[in-house]
A protein has these predicted regions:
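Extreme N-terminal leader/anchor segments
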Residues: 1-73
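Short alpha-helical hairpin
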Residues: 59-75, 82-83, 103-110
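Carbohydrate-active enzyme catalytic cores, enriched for enzymes
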Residues: 215-355
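Short alpha-helical segments and helix-capping/turn motifs at coil-helix boundaries
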Residues: 76-77, 327
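Sequence-level motif detector for i,i+2 pairs with an aromatic at +2
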Residues: 51-53, 58-60, 86, 272, ...
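Generic structural signal of hydrophobic/aromatic residues within well-ordered alpha-helices
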Residues: 10, 17, 21, 111, ...
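Aromatic-lined, polymer-binding surfaces characteristic
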Residues: 80-257
Length: 356
């Protein structure tokens, strides 16, 4: 027992030491210099923001940038949720295109001035990934009509943030963050065609994600239904970026979308019900279905069993069951229910939900 506790404490000490060293390194001038290696490149491809409507909650009411209290926008007393929302800049998608470009660009310029040097909170991997996607996708406000000095500063900041993602993505364990970061890196490569390192490296990481985390049936190895939907959304977004930018779509992206789509049809579209297995929750996939229809994606799957899930139904009753094995330890972070979990749904209402 003493030996075991000593080993655990030693392991924890090593991890803490490793984390401390990493934080020291990333806050150093050496790391800043490493990720600051940028080029004078051109913003070529202008991605359409509506391609992201599967992951962005668009509001009917649009706001003008002038409606926000810009003087206090970077105050330090924000809670974690507010901080993430502010610094990932996804709130730009709710801005009216009649907003002042000059004011919008001033907000970005202010952020760059305050955060040009890496800090672990503002440069969190997920926050940085979404910030890149937002800045590039909202180019009508963030980039168009800007002065040359800001244009250069903007391009350098995007590259610097993308360089940080390239440095970090290989060390991530959370696959959800990896796919979002991968999308941001790939978009950077499509936008700035003069530097192919972002596109080449981003696609290489995407292939690794496919190989390491998706099984041969097109279902995440975690058996996580939420993760399946997230994967499908981002793979389609990446495909649409390739299509819109008039680049050849890699075959493995089409193939992955096909198999993910079949899994999505099996687990959701065939029954139009959320199965609350494995940490899943009530979703709003109806909106995603509209997105798929709008972009011409049709998925079908007539199987009764897939990836360890079984679904039997007639006109009124649906019987669903988890008959698969638990995911391996590497993919079990959010796994909750066990084998033989089942649900009975009648006329659209759940009669029995057994988490196993």
């Amino acid at each position: 027992m003493i030996t075991k506790n000593f080993a655990v404490n030693l392991s924890q000490y090593y991890l803490n030491l490793k984390l401390s060293f990493k934080q020291f390194y990333q806050n150093s001038n050496f790391y800043d210099k490493k990720i600051s290696k940028t080029k004078d490149i051109t913003f070529d491809y202008k991605p359409s923001p509506y391609l992201l409507s599967s992951i962005v909650k668009y509001q009917k009411k649009k706001y003008k940038i002038e409606d926000f209290a810009l003087e206090t926008i970077w105050q330090n007393n924000l809670n974690n949720k507010e901080f993430k929302k502010l610094n990932n800049f996804f709130w730009f998608f709710s801005l009216d295109l009649k907003s002042s470009k000059k004011t919008t660009q001033a907000v970005i310029n202010n952020w760059i001035n305050k955060n040009n040097h890496y800090n672990n909170r503002g440069w969190d991997f997920d926050i940085t990934s979404k910030r890149i996607i937002s800045w590039l996708s909202n180019h009508q406000l963030t980039y168009e009509g800007c002065e040359e000095e800001f244009k250069k500063k903007f391009n350098q900041s995007i590259q610097k943030q993308a360089n940080h993602l390239l440095n970090e993505i290989k060390n991530l364990s959370e696959v959800e963050n990896k796919i979002i970061g991968c999308a941001a890196i790939i978009l950077t490569g499509l936008v700035y065609k003069d530097d192919n390192k972002y596109l080449t490296t981003g696609l290489n990481f995407l292939k690794k994600i496919i190989k390491s985390s998706i099984n041969n049936q097109g279902f995440p190895k975690s058996r996580d239904i939420k993760q399946l939907v997230l994967y499908l959304k981002y793979f389609i977004i990446i495909r649409e970026w390739f299509k819109e930018s008039q680049n050849t779509i890699p075959e493995y992206i089409d193939e992955t979308i096909y198999y993910l789509g079949q899994s999505y049809a099996f687990i959701w579209q065939n029954i139009n019900q959320d199965l609350l297995f494995n940490g899943n929750y009530n979703s709003n996939n109806d909106e995603f279905d509209q997105y798929l229809k709008r972009f011409g994606y049709v998925f079908k799957n007539e199987n009764k069993e897939l990836a360890g899930y079984a679904v039997l139904k007639n006109k009124k009753v649906i019987l669903s069951m988890d008959i698969g094995n638990s995911p391996s330890e590497n993919f079990s972070r959010f796994y909750q229910s066990g084998a033989l979990s089942f649900e009975v749904i009648s006329s659209g209402k759940k009669l029995i939900t057994n988490s196993g």
